[in-house]
Amino acid sequence: TEVAVSDYDKANGITAGTGGTAYETMTIDKDKGVNEIIDGYDAAGVPDNLVADRLDSAGYSLAGQMDSDGATVLIAGATALNAAQLGKDNIWETIVDIRTAMSKANIPNDGKRYLLVTPDTYALVLKCPEFTHASDLGDAVLQTGALGKIAGFLVFEWNDTTANLAMVAGHPRFATRCKEFAVPVHLQDLSGSGRYIGASAVQGRLVYAHKVLRSVAIRAVYSPGALAVTAAQGATAGGTKLTVTGASGTLKYTKNPASRAVFGAAYGGTALTSGTTEIADCAAGDVIEVAEIVSSKVKSVGYITLKASEIKA
């Protein structure tokens, strides 16, 4: 809560109050690593620098996994908005409406609001006369990596394939990442292993977590739409039940997905009946992805981040 303001009395001063600060619990729930053996004989027989290539690949893969996990939490914790089929004639209006909603929710308009747009959406933004290219905004904007600015948002192209997701708007103050522990990617000699001779391993590890601190500060826009997902306590300890609206096909779900559902792609997951299927072994902070399946392919998705009150104690 904000600090309270009171009238000041010159003779008696002002009564001191106490802070109403609330603290968020952040569970460190991701522990990822790479461990790839490179045989010395094989490495010597390859003309290019195999070791350097695998080190680069390991670093890229770990960073990519952390970014993917972060994006899943961001999308699941966001306020979902359904837009009509986006086109060059309504993209500007859609972005302005998001700007207005965020301002009404008292999200700071301090130049740090961002808009992550998929390549298809970015193509529409480029056709807007209201879009200002980064080259016209000065070094401060260029250094952020933004491609430009529109309606007060710094625009970043985001090559995401989540079904029907067009863009995510937000402010960096209201979503966070914690890097709890890391072992940088390196080449580990395995000579002392007692098993491998002349071999090494590309190893690295990251322990981290992500959390959305305020849902109204993050807006995930789907076009033509997303599933609406709500949760309630199940019948057994650790259980929850989901109610899904907006679907005409069959439903499947994945708990804490390593990657997100892609429109038109096949989907594994577990069969889900809205309001009936109980998902077991849930914990607060778990992300549930629900996919609508039509003709064996993903048509739309919805996400929810479970709260403790939605899980049977």
Language-model regions, residue ranges each:
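Extracellular recognition modules
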Residues: 287-293
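Extracellular fibronectin type III
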Residues: 297-311
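Short proline/glycine-enriched turn/loop motifs at strand-loop junctions of beta-rich domains
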Residues: 244-251, 258
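Sequence/fold signature of self-assembling virion shell proteins
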Residues: 1-4, 22-29, 128-224
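Extended, solvent-exposed, turn-rich assembly/linker loops in the middle of proteins
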Residues: 76-147, 263, 267
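Alpha-helical scaffold segments that mediate packing/assembly in large oligomeric complexes
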Residues: 40-107, 220-224
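Surface-exposed, short loops/turns at beta-strand junctions within beta-sandwich domains
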Residues: 276-287
